[in-house]
């Protein structure tokens, strides 16, 4: 008898988690949904029955006993507060926030890359990587296994759903506000008022913002998204000295993050070898031209535009493009795949 809980069940990623649990016929006999007091009491249909959403703020260790796996997508603050409570009650927590990713006692797992790390639980918590890192890992791990990864230069083009519902609503409202005046931007970037900038530094509609995430106050002038890319790649791949530089860009796309990756290796690796490796890789689909629209709604990371990097000698460099659904594999799916590993 397996009991699973979804914490943050009414949020953007929580909704995808619920859908995937049904689609994948997750082997749970009992399912419990938790959310903030604002959503508590609401009834959600799941597998033909209605489940009442429980108030996370009222949870106690006693009331949580019997839960085997808890899937968290309620934000870092809630995770820090409640994940240890669920773990103390006997659940294994799989957390989708950034709260635990840097903790040396919490494994950071991509299901296709380092599943065995689930056996190294100290706190009863497993962390899910950032959605941008997630898209790249199933692609980079088999290439690393073949040629030894030593350096990454990455530019990411991140969808507004990565900013939560506020990002989605901001883009939709700005497009509507500009309306038929959009063509006037051809000659004048100030020709129409897009309205409130929402969670961004400038209007996102008809624009590109080379500033995804929040500025880290450590003198590097990097955003937290850029630092996550570096820190998480090192931890997941088990390469603490991997050199990683990145620029994270927010683009007016609803769902689907795209990355251009310049990868340098210790050994030579040709385009043909890379294509053969990636064609057989789990969680990867080899395509000619990856796009966020094509990636939205599917499980795999799309990879294509694979070229030899002419700036790296001896065929030790590759350039490639990756697109992945930041809500699906980038958040909800990997969380559930980890849960599937736990209940096998």
From Swiss-Prot:
It is an enzyme of class 1 (oxidoreductase). NADP(+) binds at residues 10-13, 38-39, 161-162, 326. PROSITE patterns: ASD. Substrate binds at residues 158, 250. Gene3D superfamilies: Dihydrodipicolinate Reductase, domain 2, NAD(P)-binding Rossmann-like Domain. GO terms for biological process: 'de novo' L-methionine biosynthetic process; diaminopimelate biosynthetic process; isoleucine biosynthetic process; lysine biosynthetic process via diaminopimelate; threonine biosynthetic process. SUPFAM superfamilies: Glyceraldehyde-3-phosphate dehydrogenase-like, C-terminal domain (SSF55347), NAD(P)-binding Rossmann-fold domains (SSF51735). The keyword Transport does not apply. Homodimer. This is Aspartate-semialdehyde dehydrogenase. It comes from Corynebacterium flavescens.
């Amino acid at each position: 008898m397996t009991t699973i809980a979804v914490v943050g069940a009414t949020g953007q990623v929580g909704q995808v988690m619920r859908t995937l649990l049904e689609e994948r016929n997750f082997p749970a006999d009992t399912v419990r949904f938790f959310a903030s007091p604002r959503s508590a009491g609401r009834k959600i249909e799941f597998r033909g029955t209605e489940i009442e959403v429980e108030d996370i703020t009222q949870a106690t260790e006693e009331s949580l006993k019997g839960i085997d796996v808890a899937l968290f997508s309620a934000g870092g603050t809630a995770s820090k507060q409640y994940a240890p409570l669920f773990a103390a009650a006997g659940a294994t927590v799989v957390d989708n926030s950034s709260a635990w990713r840097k903790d040396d006692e919490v494994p950071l797992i991509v299901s296709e890359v380092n599943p065995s790390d689930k056996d190294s639980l100290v706190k009863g918590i497993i962390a899910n990587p950032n959605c941008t890192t997630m898209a790249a890992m199933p692609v980079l791990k088999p290439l690393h296994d073949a040629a030894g990864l030593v350096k990454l230069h990455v530019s990411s083009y991140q969808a507004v759903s990565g900013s939560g519902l506020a990002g989605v609503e901001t883009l939709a409202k700005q497009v509507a506000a500009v309306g038929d005046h959009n063509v006037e931007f051809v000659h004048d970037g100030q020709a129409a008022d897009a309205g409130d900038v929402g969670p961004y530094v400038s209007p996102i509609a008809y624009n590109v913002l080379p500033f995804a995430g929040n500025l880290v106050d450590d003198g590097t002038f990097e955003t937290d998204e850029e630092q996550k890319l570096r820190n998480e790649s090192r931890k997941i791949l088990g390469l603490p000295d991997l050199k990683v530089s990145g620029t994270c860009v927010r683009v007016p796309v609803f769902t689907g993050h795209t990355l251009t990756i310049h990868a340098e290796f210790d050994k030579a690796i040709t385009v043909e070898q890379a294509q053969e490796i990636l064609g057989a890789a789990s969680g990867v689909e080899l395509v000619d031209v990856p796009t966020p629209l094509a990636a939205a709604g599917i499980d795999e990371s799309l990879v294509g535009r694979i070229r030899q990097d002419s700036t790296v000698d001896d065929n030790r460099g590759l350039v490639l493009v990756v697109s992945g659904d930041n809500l699906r594999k980038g958040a909800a799916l990997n969380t559930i795949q980890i849960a599937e590993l736990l209940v096998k």
